[in-house]
Amino acid sequence: MVDNLDITIDDYFQKVEELKNNGFEMMVDLTAVDWFRKKEPRFELVINFLSVSKNKRVCIKVKLTDELSIPSITSLYPSANFYEREVFDMFGINFENHPDLTRILMPDDWVGHPLRKDYGTGRIPVQFKNAPKVD
């Protein structure tokens, strides 16, 4: 069973720290959802935690304001590092005090954030290195 918690940005870091101090050893997933034209606020951060010792899971959901900025939790869970970078790269969400908030999947000079629902597709020709030739 998973406990779902909807929390505010202001409570986010403190709640994650509380989970860490109460036996939730693992942050197992961190992603974002773009609710474009369906919900306000548009973006939501979803983070899953696991306590092996207690055999419990917790899912935290945080609705993001228009600033799209939230504290990084890499100081509490180093495993959040690449997840936060991926969410930054794909959605444009800023993680304050992240040790290396740079693109992780897209080229450094890429413009835009491809998993946003308003991101145009098919506009930019992409050259794939070592792509097999197809007849």
Segments from the language model and where they lie:
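Terminal low-complexity/charged segments
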Residues: 1-135
